[in-house]
Structure formats: C-alpha cells, structure tokens
A protein has these predicted regions:
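Membrane-proximal basic amphipathic "stem/tether" segments
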Residues: 1-56, 61
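Extended catalytic core of nucleotide-activated donor transferases of GT-like folds
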Residues: 43-44, 58, 69-79, 85-181
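Short acidic alpha-helix that forms the nucleotide-activated donor recognition element
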Residues: 273-286, 296, 315
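Short beta-strand->alpha-helix junction loop in the catalytic core
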Residues: 91-92, 165-167, 187-205
Length: 362
C-alpha cells in the first residue's frame, strides 16, 4: 500500500469507537486493498453461483506458488473420470499454470486472499464430491498458518490436503487427516500418502541438442539451491576447454557475482510464467537441482519435504545431474541420471557434455 492509502485507511476507521474492532477493520481493509483484483472478485462471485456437475472435484490453491503440482492433480482426476474445478489465488492464475490443458477441460476460478476466511460458508462447496487443497499452509501470514483451520475447511469430511512439510503435521493438527488417509505428500515419507503429480502436457522424447543445454529452475536462494556449486562447475568445464554448452537459469532472486569469462555460457531468464518456463524446459537436455550435501537446510528435501525440481525432471523426462546423497530418494540412479560424489558437479557436467546422442537417448 502507498503512504496515501495508509493515511486514508486510518482516517476512514477513526470513527470506530472500540480499539480492537478498529484494529480488526484496519487489518481487513489493508489486506483487501493490497490484494485487490477486480477480475478475481468477479470470478469468485461466478464460482459461488457455479452449477457444479456430478462427479466434480475442486482443487484449491490459496497461495501464489505450487502451481507446478496442479496440472498433475488435474490430469490424474480427469483420467479417473472426474470433472475438475480449480480455485486459486489470482496472482498464481496470472502465471497460467494450467496452460497445458485445452480450454473447457477444466473450469478455472480465481480469488483474493480476503475471500479465504469466509470460504467454508460457500454453499457451492457442498456440491463437490471432494475438495483437494494443494497446499495445507497459508503463506500470506507471517510464520505461516493452517489454511484448513483458518477457513474451517478442516470440518469437511470429503477433504484431502497436500502437506509440503512433515513438521507442519503436528503444528497444524493434521494427525487425524493422516490417520484417515486424507493427508497427501509428494514424497515417500513415514507420514501421509504419497501422490506425486508431474504432468505438464504431452511431451514427446526429443534428441539431445548438438550443443547441450543445462537448466535449473527455482528461487535463487541458498536455502533452496547452492548456485556457487554451479559457478565452480562452470570453472571446471571451461578449464577443460569446453565452450559448446549453455546453462539456463530460471527463478527470481540474485544470482551473485559471476566471473566475466563465465557469463557467455549463462542465460539468466529470471522469473518466468508457466508457459515460458515450460518452453525453457523443453529446450533443455539436463536438469541441475543444485542441492548441496554440505548444507543442512537441504536435508529437508530427503527427510520432510521434496524439491519441485523432481516434478519437472519427471514430467519433462530430463536427465538430472544430482549428488548421490539426494538421488535414491527421488528414484534416480546410474541408469536414469548423472550422479556425482567425489568428482563434483563439474565432473558430472563434463560427462554430460561428452555424451553422444545415442548415449543420451538410452
């Protein structure tokens, strides 16, 4: 919000006599104005009046992220004979995560954050055979909150929820969902039922580019990926005299300092919408998850959560270049991936560059 909007907000609520009530209204109006989207308001009204057909399941994503899992869930349900409606935050919808479906295959609706708290009161929910929440946490609240409890959806008996972080099961009180088999996870963990969606359209096998293309996708933060590993690997490859390759970097954030002699090999695309990201994935030959075995923060990707990189590798059938520590959890081995340990990422990238088209196709 701008300073002028903040001042106007305070003036509008000054007439409310009770401090707690005044604070509550200021918070609501601030959230409403900062997230306001006219199309989303219209879409939400249309959804509430929507004549839901039989055997329809609602997929609901309350956040601005995790759009990569929605197409796979939609594909699974459509293949099982269900109809699918999707309700998502308007900022995610603008990124077009469902661009791989034909118009009419799925009904798509959008909403603002301020619509979520009253969601459970919507009568249209009773018409769905089931409701699938693709992220159980609501990230718009500091420290995150349980979207199910916040909205009252946890009281629905036909609810399924996807938990992206096992540590949140006790924090959000999801033990009963887990016991009833209604809590889903994207990986094979001791808790939750594994369902790994990774559909991004019909993607035929493609031959390797004459000059191999590597790609990494995701937020440029040390907590998620170690991009210093990539710089070191590029140094290794260049020192061996190879120049016939490129690396596409997709994601928001700061990459850090890149030596000038390495920049010609990098294409920093920044954050892309889903159609552009899908196109970049199609052009690539190898995927770089950039998980660091020496970073304790990356242990969560084999203990309590998964990396979204795996969904992209599975769905686009790209060869991952990944450290052995993380490989087996995702089903990667010497037959379907390029693994490294002592030889480092640079050594594995050299093996990729030296592969023939026949070896790649195997």
């Amino acid at each position: 919000m701008t300073h002028t909007q903040t001042v106007m907000l305070r003036l509008l609520t000054m007439c409310i006599p009770f401090r707690n009530l005044r604070k509550k209204w200021r918070t609501f109006l601030r959230d409403f104005l900062s997230d306001y989207d006219r199309d989303a308001r219209r879409s939400m009204r249309a959804w509430r009046r929507h004549p839901v057909a039989g055997r329809t399941i609602l997929i609901l994503e309350p956040n601005y992220c995790h759009g990569e899992v929605i197409p796979g869930f939609c594909r699974h349900l459509l293949d099982m004979g269900y109809r699918v409606d999707v309700l998502m935050h308007h900022s995610l919808a603008r990124q077009s995560p469902l661009c791989c479906f034909k118009e009419g295959d799925i009904h798509i609706f959008t909403a603002m954050c301020t619509s979520w708290k009253r969601l459970a009161k919507a009568r249209v929910l009773t018409r769905y055979e089931a409701i699938l929440i693709s992220t159980s946490a609501f990230y718009d609240i500091p420290g995150w909150a349980s979207f199910l409890h916040m909205t009252g959806l946890d009281k629905f008996a036909n609810l399924l929820a996807v938990e992206h972080e096992l540590k949140d099961i006790p924090r959000f009180g999801e033990e009963e969902l887990d016991r009833q088999g209604r809590l889903l996870t994207l990986g094979s963990f001791p808790r939750g039922m594994m369902v790994n969606p990774h559909f991004f359209g019909e993607i035929p096998p493609a031959p390797r580019n004459r000059e191999p293309v590597f790609i990494t996708v995701g937020s440029l933060s040390a907590q998620r990926k170690n991009h210093e590993l990539l710089v070191e690997a590029l140094e290794t490859v260049c020192n061996e005299g190879y120049r016939n390759f490129s690396v596409i970097i997709v994601g928001e954030g700061e990459l850090g300092k890149i030596p000038g002699h390495l920049r010609p090999f990098l294409h920093v695309a920044g954050k892309l919408d889903f159609p552009a990201m899908y196109e970049a994935m199609r052009r690539a030959d190898y995927f770089l998850p950039l998980l660091d075995p020496g970073n304790p923060a990356h242990n969560r990707y084999i203990t309590t959560g998964v990396t979204g990189s795996a969904q992209l590798v599975y769905g686009f059938a790209k060869i991952p270049v990944i450290h052995e520590k993380f490989a087996s959890f995702y089903g990667f081995n010497d037959r379907n991936a390029l693994l490294y340990r002592e030889e480092t990422l640079g050594g594995a990238m050299l093996r990729a560059i030296r592969q023939t088209e026949e070896e790649y196709a195997e």
